Amino acid sequence: INFNDFERARTSDDTEISGFRNCYQKVLSKEFDKKIYECVGKVLQKYADTFVHFSTGLTTEDTGYMHLIYKGSEKGEYKTHTDHFDLYPRVLSCSFILNDKYDGGDFSFFDGEHVVKKKTGSVVVFPSNFCFPHAVTPVTNGDRHAIITWIR
């Protein structure tokens, strides 16, 4: 993915992004945004407790939240990519799985070598760097909902 593709993906609203991402993005209410913020704090604490050498530097902040909807009727997907770019440095990526009543739409790493099991309410946390290429495979039935954020 090149910078122009990344920039379009980062700023999109309800559009397909240059063949890399085919999903819809919804804005979260301020009330829900606060709830997610609290969840992210708990997730980060658990991550830091598990990986004692984890550090983002002097300050830690998230980049806001996006509700992504991958529609089965449109084969919604996000092709293999990484989340860190020099202009938008990110340390950790977080994907909250909001539902599991859909087919396809697997969150996978390393060209499908590792597939994350779908479970409503779970969160996937991983380093944003080049060592963790990941994708969402096409949804074939139902709609996949997730909230994503990045920590920098």
Where in the sequence are the language-model features?
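Acidic/histidine-enriched, beta-strand-rich ligand/metal-binding domains
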Residues: 33-39, 50-53, 64, 122, ...
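Short, conserved beta-strand element in jelly-roll/cupin
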Residues: 67-72, 85-103, 150-151
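Residue-level preference for beta-strand/loop junctions
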Residues: 59, 76, 88-90, 143
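Catalytic core of Fe(II)/2-oxoglutarate
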Residues: 90, 101-152
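Histidine-centered catalytic micro-motifs
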Residues: 77-85
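Non-heme Fe(II)/2-oxoglutarate
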Residues: 1-59
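Acidic, glycine-rich loop-and-strand cores that form catalytic or ligand-binding grooves
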Residues: 55-71
